[in-house]
């Protein structure tokens, strides 16, 4: 049963009950009856035909919305995407720094500064009235609606590691010192919604840093050179605030050189409700790019920016937004995912990223190993800091991780060995597997195994060495041999930690930090490094080394090594459309320990896949035997540095989702973007796998990336309907209802409209088209061609899609928008009927039907309404944001619609015109209010915390005055008169609504705030139109 029919079945008895008296039947015609209300109307334009197409699209749209909501809420994340954070505890204490008052910052009444101390571990924060500071200053910046207490987890871990002599001994830092964690209390400000709030925080924190450094200057017994800089740790929008700080006039030069951000949206603003936020992003990014482009600037030589994101579990902020690729080069920072970080290996949600046990241990070590108490800067040089960050935050398989590896620089790191050091060795030929196992050690009679690296073959293009072991520290030597001496480098710093994959592990985090099961170790070296050496020496492990491994069952210890000159990379050129139609069959033999499948055409973050794996039929018997390890997969992309680990994959269905090429996110188009799957397979085992599209996960992730479309798409459709309504109104003097007009559009132009929604994505992805769109962009804040010298490019238009295959999303969103608008419209219609019914029940008598209309119709704006409007504008000018006045206008428009519905008219056609006009305008204002409400939330929050300073932004009375006066006109039942279509007045009205439609579709998602201004301009025209006619 269609929605319209369902509403009719519910409401018809009420209408019949009211109409039973007879005398009011001519008065109570509603929009539900408009198909029968005016024969003349039907004969003129036939717009009110039964909209079966509209019903179909409405039902499909509502079903799509429900399905998407159910999938988003109910579908769990599985396997590598499942949350595995462990619980933590700490004993926090906070000392409020009251000395940082109005003498140092004008924002002291609004914000506060605290010093964190871990109870029973740290030094007491106060000695009488004086702060006790003996460490290195770190400033924690909370995010949107964040608390200063969120610093406690990382600060606690830093204190526990440093003040425990055993754990402090494991730090690779001779000049380590305890950390003094300062944290800012912003009273849970909504930073993401309001640019002025972000500026306030940045200004306050610059003053706070200046004050913090002065505290150390006044500390007489500080044991080291006085600090001249502060380490920054920012969560969410706090990371953006930290970047803004360096652009302000009150920034102390050199006071910030190390920034670590957690789930911070560097690449793009997560919301576009406020123009100030977008301008702040633009100005800050341009400042950073300019500074970093100068090789001799402080930024280039000192600033490090490391961004960490929780990946797929961050449903508050799309993980794609955490990329810093367009801001800093790899010499100054990078982006990593928590699924990539060794000993963490789990996705983390937006809030948990500040307290997750596994991650906080790594972050604490990163901070403690990056500092240098002997220097005033209190941090190591830039290249050393990034080397530490790469070691701790990347998997180690990335080429970027090898930048500072000792193996990469043999001339500087080779050590001389005596000729007889490796005297007891056996030689292993290339392509033969070295297989040390706990139960077969006796068959290996030599202490070392030598693997010669070929140098005289015609091509070593595919030369690679792979080692995988359960040992904690395998001994591997990369050696060069000359006539004079033997020189080698131990591969200690190149041994990588990978998750343990066995029958008793399900998730990568099962062998992460603090777990009973030890992870595996691996070495993966390519030709570029191997060609610098003559041979490898691998030490034979002892039985004791195997047996001492925690979580190791009998006979499970192993060490596998293999040198091959055969490519272990299989390139698959299958496209998403081919996977959709046929799937992709994969075959992996057991000839190599690590085999890589590179999907050259799979790079779109919007698509998720499902991978089903099984043992090849020819060797299924292996499944019942004890293998050295269970096959596992490292899923990865080149940049950003995201890796995921899928364990124990036999007979499993794996979810494959990546953060790669994403909507609206800048990327370097010269870098490879292929999805990579590295299979680690025991010798002799062959696997079969099939890849298909995972539609449920794809749809689940759509909502996270396109939440802003919930405002822009409905506004575009409503504006399109209004343009048609005014067209028919000017043509026939009949203003059709929203439902009938949308139904007419779908019936007459639905195929063209949805084809346009599909075709728009590949069209706006064209660079020539983007240049034209940028020239036509009235906002001008989103330049697609960011850094041409680095091939950095972004698609800010429409849905930001770069692949034609996902262009169908436009059609899906179009259908969902029709369903949403139909649902809202029917709710309004039902409320209208209910109001009429209640009015008839409560009213005792009805008089002067026509006279009442005539009196109101000729009524002037009135002094009372004029004074109320002027008073509201004065409030906007002096105190409240104009968004608040907009919502007040929305409430007045709702009241107007109710009053129009209750009118008793002899001329039913006039009432329908007035009702349809006001109802459609109400729909428009309702969805625009979704854009304005976040600013109101910020304003009310400031009122709640009794912040006395006025709301310094959004006091432009011109941004809301036309809306206020138009709604005031509507409240006295005025509406624009119909004019001939061939006049400029009629054309301008239609052109304005068409432009709003196009803008909302093409520019709307990334410029939501501008939609309000366009609606305001249209209201100004309608107000002028009503006045002159």
UniProtKB/Swiss-Prot annotation:
Its EC number is 3.1.-.-. One of its GO terms (biological process) is protein retention in ER lumen. The chain crosses the membrane at residues 57-77, 708-728, 749-769, 804-824, 872-892, 920-940, 957-977, 985-1005, 1008-1028. It is found in: Endoplasmic reticulum membrane. It is an enzyme of class 3 (hydrolase). GO terms for cellular component: endoplasmic reticulum; endoplasmic reticulum membrane. PROSITE patterns: LIPASE_SER. It holds the Pfam family PGAP1_2nd. It is a multi-pass membrane protein. Glycosylated. GO terms for molecular function: phosphatidylinositol deacylase activity. The active site is at residue 236. Glycans are attached at residues 19, 295, 302, 447, 456, 485, 565, 651, 668, 694, 918. The keyword Transport applies. Belongs to the GPI inositol-deacylase family. Involved in inositol deacylation of GPI-anchored proteins which plays important roles in the quality control and ER-associated degradation of GPI-anchored proteins. Required for the transport of misfolded protein to the Golgi, although dipensable for the transport of many normal proteins. This is GPI inositol-deacylase. It comes from Saccharomyces cerevisiae (strain ATCC 204508 / S288c) (Baker's yeast). The gene is BST1.
